């Protein structure tokens, strides 16, 4: 009888933290899977340093083309693009490249003190209205960490 109680107590002690973890972290894990979006592949002119500005929901602009499963976001030499496509909601693993002709060089978005080249992403709502919705502006900085800090 004592063995059954000891076993029951051990199961309770081990399972309690697991159950608490499921109740606390479970909704966040489920949210990650429910709010995925198609990833974007950003093509930035080779050597460009500065703010990238992508304006979405622009009535007279073309939609974003696709490259496999990616939305292809090719910005001009001034770091801008206007598209009639909507800014997708959710999370995805976006890719960032410098491009020149047909060659591409991957840019790291590793983060602080890790050699990253993509910084400070922001989403703004703009006053111009398309189909009853304001346009959206996505901005991020391309350059070294030092360049971003001096922006």
Regions found by a protein language model. Name each.
Residues 1-22:
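N-terminal Sec-pathway targeting helices
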Residues 23-151:
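Protease-labile, long low-complexity intrinsically disordered regions enriched in Pro/Ser/Thr
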């Amino acid at each position: 009888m004592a063995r059954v109680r000891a076993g029951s107590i051990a199961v309770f002690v081990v399972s309690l933290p697991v159950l608490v973890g499921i109740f606390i972290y479970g909704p966040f894990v489920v949210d990650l899977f429910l709010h995925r979006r198609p990833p974007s592949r950003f093509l930035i002119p080779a050597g460009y340093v500065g703010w990238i500005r992508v304006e979405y929901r622009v009535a007279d602009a073309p939609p974003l083309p696709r490259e496999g499963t990616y939305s292809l976001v090719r910005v001009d030499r001034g770091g801008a693009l206007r598209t009639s496509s909507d800014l997708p909601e959710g999370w995805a693993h976006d890719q960032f490249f410098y491009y020149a002709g047909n060659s591409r060089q991957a840019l790291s978005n590793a983060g602080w003190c890790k050699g990253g080249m993509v910084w400070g992403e922001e989403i703004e709502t703009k006053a111009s209205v398309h189909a009853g919705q304001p346009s959206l502006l996505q901005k991020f900085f391309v350059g070294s960490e030092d360049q971003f800090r001096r922006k």
